[in-house]
């Protein structure tokens, strides 16, 4: 039986975290943003599918960099 590929475990895919509604609301309030002002990620994106993200959810992306250290970004899940 073939092994299933887990996109979240690939070395080139940064850590993605699906935020709860409460976490997303706290984040948006702290940053003074509306959900509509966040960059998008489509619900059909392989990582969004692996996280079972639904349109309207917010995903936190944590990237490691040898020069910048750690970079955190947020994406709004859109139907797509």
Swiss-Prot record:
One biological process term from GO is: transcription by RNA polymerase II
Instruction: List its EC numbers.
Output: 2.7.7.6
Source organism's superkingdom? Answer: Archaea
Q: Name one Pfam family in it.
A: RNA_pol_Rpb5_C
Which reaction is the catalytic activity of this chain?
RNA(n) + a ribonucleoside 5'-triphosphate = RNA(n+1) + diphosphate
In the record, which residues are listed under signal peptide? none
- Give its localization: Cytoplasm
What GO CC terms are in its UniProt record? cytoplasm; DNA-directed RNA polymerase complex
Q: Which UniProt keywords apply?
A: Cytoplasm, DNA-directed RNA polymerase, Nucleotidyltransferase, Transcription, Transferase
In alphabetical order, the GO MF annotations are: DNA binding; DNA-directed RNA polymerase activity
Which PROSITE patterns has this protein been placed in? RNA_POL_H_23KD
This protein's major location comes to cytoplasm
Show the coiled coil region(s).
none
The family this protein is said to belong to: Belongs to the archaeal Rpo5/eukaryotic RPB5 RNA polymerase subunit family.
Q: What does this protein do?
A: DNA-dependent RNA polymerase (RNAP) catalyzes the transcription of DNA into RNA using the four ribonucleoside triphosphates as substrates.
Subunit note: Part of the RNA polymerase complex.
Name of the protein this chain belongs to: DNA-directed RNA polymerase subunit Rpo5
Q: Which organism is it from?
A: Thermofilum pendens (strain DSM 2475 / Hrk 5)
